[in-house]
Amino acid sequence: MIPIIALVGRPNVGKSTLFNKLTHTNDAIVADYSGLTRDRKYGHAKWKNYNFIVIDTGGIGISKKGLAIHIIKQSLLAIKEADVIFFVVDAITGLMIEDQSIAKYLRKLQKPTFIIINKIDGIDITQVKLQFYAINIGQIFPIAALQGRGINILLKAVFLSLIQNNIPLTNNSFTESTKYIDQLLMPIKLAIVGSSNVGKSTLANSFLGEERVVVFDMPGTTRDSTYIPMIRAEREYVLIDTAGLRKRSKITDIAEKLSTVKTLQSIEESNVVLLVLDAHKGISDQDLSLLSLIIDSGRAFVIVVNKWDNLSIERRNSIKDTLAYRLSFINFARIHFISALYGTNIDQIFQSVNEAYHCSTKRISTALLTKILHIAIKEHQPPIISGYRVKLKYAHYGGYNPPIVVIHGNKATELPVSYKRYLSNFFRHSLQIMGTPIRIQFNEPANPFIHHKSIPNKLRKLLLSKRNIKIK
């Protein structure tokens, strides 16, 4: 299961700072969704070998009538769906009446809750902790989110608590050969995601259609996902339900139509993601945010432009030009123009899904990767940094889904972004990787003398003189 952690608290206590620390915002994509999840932030995070999802629920205020939660209905639902609550408070201001009201609200949820006392620098934390012991809703952890102090201890306690409560977790540590064989034998898990009313459920029904073998609810690793097994062209797949796959008669709550939390879970649990766009609406900023989340997760993906029927040639050409411009940064992705309603061009989607899955899980030898690296260097030498040319020595395979290439060399981590991008593109084209992101990691050998103190000059002369060694 991918645990969900919700950050809750009144405004200006440092929730966003903690969110950025947990998600490593410089690397991870943070999506700000408009409309359904306006002003809320969702992000992927990782601690040790465990992945989790973080939700910044925004500020909770208080009115004359008591607790007034100034967040939209879907954010409340996200809090209720969370596995763990981080109740963030301010060490400088201490316990406030708003904190007491929020604690009263959280106590009703009966979720594992951790009190996070932020901004502890220069504060007598013992006195502050005594104030918050009174609300008695969970363990207390003092942190400095801006500096990152105390966060590792906090996360260790969180995951220890989850394990002790027998909650299954998704662990990235594995035995390479065993997991790779299992991956090849398992059905391809296919998540269908997209904005509302783009035709996700119509596409799913078109997939199932005559080829549907059995439909049942298979309890998955994410609490609210429905898994629908199917077979197409003798290949097994599992469609991951993201609310749009349910029958319309069963959807009574607007939150079920598009839950960002469920979408994030579906992406994490899938092997390949189908991002569905509406040909009539083009690609929106929300579509691009969702695409960024998919890329950030490292999942293979295929883009499907639905409702392609009944469009003029001029309109189709215009849409293709717009997509080519706005999606130029993902020239490795397959794009299909279909009509889910009439089943037009559906079969080609599965060809691209299989290709993307194969590319994301393929194994590559160290010899081949090193050979490609040397060819890339020969065609375009690494730059000179601080008077020395970067020397890249060898490359090896670092993982799959997404494919990871680890390059070793002196000053490798100091390479400019432009050269790193060149190497990434070179490996992609050389290995013919389509439909999946590829990640390049750079390692350089540790300096064995970095922690050795130099010998004072006088002592050095004395030692050498005892050995009858002349110093020039």
From Swiss-Prot:
GO biological process per UniProt: ribosome biogenesis
Chain ranges of the EngA-type G domain: 3-166, 188-361
PANTHER family linked: GTPASE DER (PTHR43834:SF6)
Recorded superkingdom: Bacteria
Binding-site residues, GTP 2: 194-201, 241-245, 306-309
GO MF: GTP binding; ribosome binding
Keyword Repeat recorded: yes
Assembly description: Associates with the 50S ribosomal subunit.
Annotated function: GTPase that plays an essential role in the late steps of ribosome biogenesis.
Entry's family note: Belongs to the TRAFAC class TrmE-Era-EngA-EngB-Septin-like GTPase superfamily. EngA (Der) GTPase family.
InterPro entries: G_ENGA, GTP-bd, GTPase_Der, KH_dom-like, KH_dom-like_a/b, P-loop_NTPase, Small_GTP-bd
Keyword entries, A-Z: GTP-binding, Nucleotide-binding, Repeat, Ribosome biogenesis
Alphabetized Pfam families for the sequence: KH_dom-like, MMR_HSR1
Gene encoding the protein: der
NCBIfam families for this protein: GTPase_EngA, small_GTP
Protein name: GTPase Der
Binding site for GTP 1: 9-16, 56-60, 118-121
Span of domain KH-like: 362-446
